[in-house]
Amino acid sequence: MAFKPIRNLLVARKRKKSGLPPGTLVYTGSVDSGETRIVTVDYGVESHQVTETIMPIAPNTGNSRWVSVTKINDIGVIKKLGQDYNIDDLYLEDILNTHQRPKIEFSDNVIFVCLQHLYRGRETKALTSEQVSLILTPSGIIS
């Protein structure tokens, strides 16, 4: 039985952030084509509303909210999301560093989860990893 190649799992990790202070926002993943996409789902007791944008929508207080962000290579959008939702820069730094080891951190009213999603590519069938970060708050989730 032959083993399929494994991409992005054993890749030499480049140090793009050497010498920078903690909380500095630097994207360490591969440059992905396309722009950052944000899907916001507001859940109420009897309804929900889905909104797709390229910039974060300000937090609301009435409903629970799920904010799903894809293609995180635009640091400006991630920084704005952090400002709007009061996310600590250290969490944003961990989100942008796509070579994080799986971890979970607890702080005041926030649970931060970082993990690796493994999947097989469609064309090459190679095993690939992708970082998934979750920020759980009393009013919703950001992924």
Task: Annotate the PLM regions.
Residues 1-143:
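Peripheral, non-transmembrane regulatory/ligand-interaction domains of membrane transport proteins
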